[in-house]
């Protein structure tokens, strides 16, 4: 049965315990817990860390507290969340992202969570085909580790293309059904799937319902979000404009995703 939860990245500045408390008070049943490494955030909702995954691996008492505190409030942890660019053209940033993602996978096993939610990443200045080659180099060891740990890795389908900073290709390759098929073909694994967010289909003008049926066995986790497309703005700037020029993220029910479908 699907549980309705909360991504704790919106609670920047709150402790893990405070995030659990507020989620429980609001009636949520699970948490996707933000687990970025310590440091300055490079974008909104990034850089938040409610669980120290390196400490989880080293400190059994801390790991037990993380699980027990949530359980004591009637919550489970649906996933450990970290959304970096593992294919960043900056090799130092790329290596750091990959290393920390592997730490999350190991911590997810130890905590009994069994899920990590993240991005594939993308070198925004390279073609799709060149990024496929990067994927072949970077991702098999990550997924093989997940298999060994009994952890599922769920990739969110956000293109990470909003404005000039991500232009022209965006910073997350895995964002359309044809790319899903190609990457699942290149790396077939029961540990490799989707954290599906239909809102990103709205401004790309794709059929999210069809994707649910086609990739039903790969839907490990779902984001409940919405986007409003503004046709009058799109008619002025066209699809090659920055996406935020013709769409906006909104509260679910106020956008174009037909959630009851």
Enumerate the predicted regions with their spans:
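Active-site acidic/histidine proton-transfer and metal-coordination neighborhood
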Residues: 18, 64-79, 85-193, 203, ...
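N-terminal small/glycine-rich loop or linker at the start of catalytic domains
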Residues: 1-7, 42, 77-88, 122, ...
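Histidine-acidic metal/acid-base catalytic patches
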Residues: 1-30, 35-39, 61-64, 71, ...
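Glycine-rich, proline-tolerant flexible connector loops at the mouths of alpha/beta enzymes
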Residues: 32-66, 126
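A short, structure-level motif marking secondary-structure boundaries and short turns
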Residues: 3-6, 50-52, 88-90, 126-128, ...
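Short glycine-enriched, charge-decorated loop/helix-capping segments at active-site entrances
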Residues: 48-56, 94, 169-170, 248-251
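Alpha-helix boundary/capping detector
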Residues: 32, 49, 96-97, 133-135, ...
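Short histidine/acidic/glycine/proline-rich micro-motifs that form metal-
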Residues: 10-11, 37, 52-54, 83-88, ...
């Amino acid at each position: 049965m699907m549980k309705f939860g909360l991504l704790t990245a919106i609670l920047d500045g709150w402790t893990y315990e405070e995030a659990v408390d507020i989620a429980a008070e609001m009636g949520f049943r699970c948490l996707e817990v933000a687990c970025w490494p310590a440091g300055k955030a490079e974008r909104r909702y990034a850089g938040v860390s409610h669980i120290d995954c390196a400490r989880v691996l080293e400190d059994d008492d801390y790991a037990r507290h993380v699980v027990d505190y949530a359980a004591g409030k009637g919550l489970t942890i649906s996933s450990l969340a970290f959304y970096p660019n593992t294919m960043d053209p900056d090799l130092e940033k790329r290596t750091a992202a990959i290393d920390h993602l592997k730490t999350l996978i190991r911590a997810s096993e130890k905590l009994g969570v069994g899920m990590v939610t993240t991005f594939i990443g993308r070198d925004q200045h390279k073609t799709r085909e060149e990024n496929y080659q990067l994927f072949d180099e970077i991702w098999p060891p990550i997924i093989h580790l997940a298999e060994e740990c009994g952890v599922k890795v769920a990739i969110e389908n956000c293109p990470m293309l909003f404005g000039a900073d991500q232009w022209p290709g965006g910073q997350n390759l895995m964002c359309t059904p044809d790319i899903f098929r190609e990457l699942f073909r290149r790396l077939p694994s029961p540990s490799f799937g989707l954290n599906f967010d239909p809102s990103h289909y709205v401004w790309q003008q794709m059929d999210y319902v069809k994707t649910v049926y086609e990739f039903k066995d790969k839907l490990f986790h779902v984001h409940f979000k919405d986007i409003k497309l503004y046709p009058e703005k799109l008619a002025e700037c066209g699809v090659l404009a920055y996406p935020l020029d013709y769409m906006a993220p909104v509260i679910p029910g106020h956008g174009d995703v037909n959630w009851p479908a």
